[in-house]
Amino acid sequence: MAAAYLDPNLNHTPSSSTKTHLGTGMERSPGAMERVLKVFHYFESSSEPTTWASIIRHGDATDVRGIIQKIVDSHKVKHVACYGFRLSHLRSEEVHWLHVDMGVSSVREKYELAHPPEEWKYELRIRYLPKGFLNQFTEDKPTLNFFYQQVKSDYMQEIADQVDQEIALKLGCLEIRRSYWEMRGNALEKKSNYEVLEKDVGLKRFFPKSLLDSVKAKTLRKLIQQTFRQFANLNREESILKFFEILSPVYRFDKECFKCALGSSWIISVELAIGPEEGISYLTDKGCNPTHLADFNQVQTIQYSNSEDKDRKGMLQLKIAGAPEPLTVTAPSLTIAENMADLIDGYCRLVNGATQSFIIRPQKEGERALPSIPKLANSEKQGMRTHAVSVSETDDYAEIIDEEDTYTMPSTRDYEIQRERIELGRCIGEGQFGDVHQGVYLSPENPALAVAIKTCKNCTSDSVREKFLQEALTMRQFDHPHIVKLIGVITENPVWIIMELCTLGELRSFLQVRKYSLDLASLILYAYQLSTALAYLESKRFVHRDIAARNVLVSSNDCVKLGDFGLSRYMEDSTYYKASKGKLPIKWMAPESINFRRFTSASDVWMFGVCMWEILMHGVKPFQGVKNNDVIGRIENGERLPMPPNCPPTLYSLMTKCWAYDPSRRPRFTELKAQLSTILEEEKVQQEERMRMESRRQATVSWDSGGSDEAPPKPSRPGYPSPRSSEGFYPSPQHMVQTNHYQVSGYPGSHGIPAMAGSIYQGQASLLDQTELWNHRPQEMSMWQPSVEDSAALDLRGMGQVLPPHLMEERLIRQQQEMEEDQRWLEKEERFLKPDVRLSRGSIDREDGSFQGPTGNQHIYQPVGKPDPAAPPKKPPRPGAPGHLSNLSSISSPADSYNEGVKLQPQEISPPPTANLDRSNDKVYENVTGLVKAVIEMSSKIQPAPPEEYVPMVKEVGLALRTLLATVDETIPALPASTHREIEMAQKLLNSDLGELISKMKLAQQYVMTSLQQEYKKQMLTAAHALAVDAKNLLDVIDQARLKMLGQTRPH
């Protein structure tokens, strides 16, 4: 049998200086005749099924067995004896099954004389099936998949248009289930998913033309959706076995039948059936039971020849053990007799575990006189190669290239580097195939160029070597300032890829280490640079397929480069690339990539959106704590990654566009590049403005002290301007107008004087509005926000009082210490003080509207504007002053506190009455207080509590509310009838609030350990807060009714 190997240069012409190496390490002799054979097969790849093929190089002595052996070896097949080799003429029904001992060159010369080579199709097929073949094939996945694809192809070509509509629907839906086994059972309910299947993949791949033509599109869609749901829980293997189960009653794919006659003349016309269960049997009429002739283990010899009559029919003779005379079968032609002989011989070899043929015949052209040479061990092969051999012997090889991943070796002239010029340094990382080292390239142009060297641990295997070098093939086609450059390759073992070195390492690690030193402008700059690289790839029709922060390298503090092109693919003439196998980054992938393994520039856009999110989150991975299998379900439920803290809403809006479920609605990289450029420029302008404001504030604080030794006064509480801090908290009215579109509630920044000037993107819902500030303290505003002329005069006054240097230094140090103390004091006070702006139901809804719950199918975190200033908030009380029930000061606003881990500070409440009434025996008042205390207790325990403890806590609140409402029902009859309606409305509102709390609790339990868990906890607190506020409102309504009643009974 011919030795076979893989040569990556097969489909490309190497340069004259390039050595062509065999996969086994043996060099080809010059002048050796070689021919190329294209063999079609059913090993699944990313291309269309009709194009699945391998390109084979063969020499004069290569036999059919050698070609079969190499193809199946490359796919790690166990049941090699089941495979046969078929030659078909495309313009007629002429079919020849080629025996494994036939020489390929002789076969080609024989048949290509009759018809041109392009009219012949060489095909690898499974022909010989063992008993219980499905059970055996389940342990040999490549063979099971091969046989399934073969049977499915035969079914679609031969009988699909004749089968019942229900069977055709089931078989088609099983193929959809098998092909896209990671797709959820209800995925086809989504219009965009069905359209991908219908328009991009094509329904004709799954269903016969007769079905598609006879059923209306809308009806067909419903039928497919209903049928697909029946198989929603099947995996790939179960789908295949179910397919065979449904198909076998209408199509016997496990046997072959031949019309012939028993005996040497046409006496008994029969249909000979040959298969694993029947052995050799015949049927005289359709529908009758087969008559058994012989088992394969009884066959001793097989002979065939032309008959002696003028019709030249084919004669087949089988010598059966125990039979008095040979079994003679007359076939319509010699070709059919040969095909029958090959089939029976294959079954005999399979059953007996033999390699020797059972066919006895005279030597003919195209056949070998001796059986194939058995396969030798590697050591024996190497030993043989040391001997002098003739040219014809060195040509005895078969060479295979899978068209799926054809690789072109970079030419020696341009990219081959001598290993002596590389100094290998320390290991700086680990790649998919091996370690990555730092090193030095000693080139004539640059004597000591720092480089990164990718090594391959197991590149002795041709397939691993090919896949490893695929990245170099891809990278050499790119030249962009934000894409890592290929410097060269070393193709001799050990194989190395040499690339430019990015000294600061992976972007994800860089972001984590520099989390507190990188400003927002730098993060947006990185995203913009990546968008330029990806726009470049898009223009060259490449899909990257693995865009993530871990695959971006940092060249300098202001330059990042896209790397790791191991998964990149050129899309050729199609608009998408389909991956057939391999590990893929599920949590970064677009839904169509997860469901259909479909990769396009639009799917790269989705991944880029996730990568931008990683950058803004300083290296946090997406969907932390979620299993890969659960990601697609969450995406299809409308879940999206939440808005990162301090992220400009315009940038988050751009991310959400990248995450549109429908690929056609996502922007292109050219659009992303332009929009990111605009966002980057806006951020730079805002950054410069904040720096000017900070400088002006520091100068004002420093100069205003003049020659006085008095320290600056302590700033007022959060939400109340002081003379010193007003300029830091509030930009000028012109600046306020410019920056309103960057204000987002729910993301408070750090507090205190040093951070005040930098609060452009921070939540400002608790701060007084600029116009209200003027209304509150016009004198202070006029005093501490002078005009430009006044500012200049003030500056001159401050500069005029010059202090000795040592006194100035001491004063500045003291002021700095006091400012730090003020900062700590502010942070401490803010935990207990929240302005009243959060107490109205309307402001709660507006502030926490950054996530409005499930709306439609999209759970997207929506940025909101500042609160409506139509009703100015009231001034909160001083710290320690007697509280009022309406303040509910012990309940922190969920929108702010949840960003600090929901650290709520429950306090004892002793609320004074809202009206001058006797509370000694006021059950309504007591129960309202009890309800508020239950809410406070729940709020304090919700953060560390596991999901199973949510129900008891909410139940306590519900019991307190039920007691309150029962008490109100007892109180209503004693109150004026005119007030009953208002009281009942307040009761209904409380019931609605409890329902909202229970709804949010269920969502928090459902999305435990996901990115939405914290958000739904926050919404639970918001609902509980609303319940407490409305309970107090109910008390106010009842108090008003009591006062009205007292006024009616009072004597006039």
UniProtKB/Swiss-Prot annotation:
Phosphoserine, modified sites: S29, S54, S580, S722, S732, S843, S910
Record comment regarding domains: The first Pro-rich domain interacts with the SH3 domain of CAS family members, such as BCAR1 and NEDD9. The C-terminal region is the site of focal adhesion targeting (FAT) sequence which mediates the localization of FAK1 to focal adhesions.
Modification after translation, per record: Phosphorylated on tyrosine residues upon activation, e.g. upon integrin signaling. Tyr-397 is the major autophosphorylation site, but other kinases can also phosphorylate this residue. Phosphorylation at Tyr-397 promotes interaction with SRC and SRC family members, leading to phosphorylation at Tyr-576, Tyr-577 and at additional tyrosine residues. FGR promotes phosphorylation at Tyr-397 and Tyr-576. FER promotes phosphorylation at Tyr-577, Tyr-861 and Tyr-925, even when cells are not adherent. Tyr-397, Tyr-576 and Ser-722 are phosphorylated only when cells are adherent. Sumoylated; this enhances autophosphorylation.
Keyword Cytoplasm applies: yes
Modification Phosphotyrosine, positions: Y5, Y397, Y407, Y570, Y576, Y577, Y861, Y925
The Protein kinase domain, residue ranges: 431-680
Topology of the protein relative to the lipid bilayer: Peripheral membrane protein
Gene: Ptk2
Modified residues (N-acetylalanine): A2
Compositionally biased spans, kind Basic and acidic residues: 685-697, 837-849
Natural source organism: Mus musculus
Protein name: Focal adhesion kinase 1
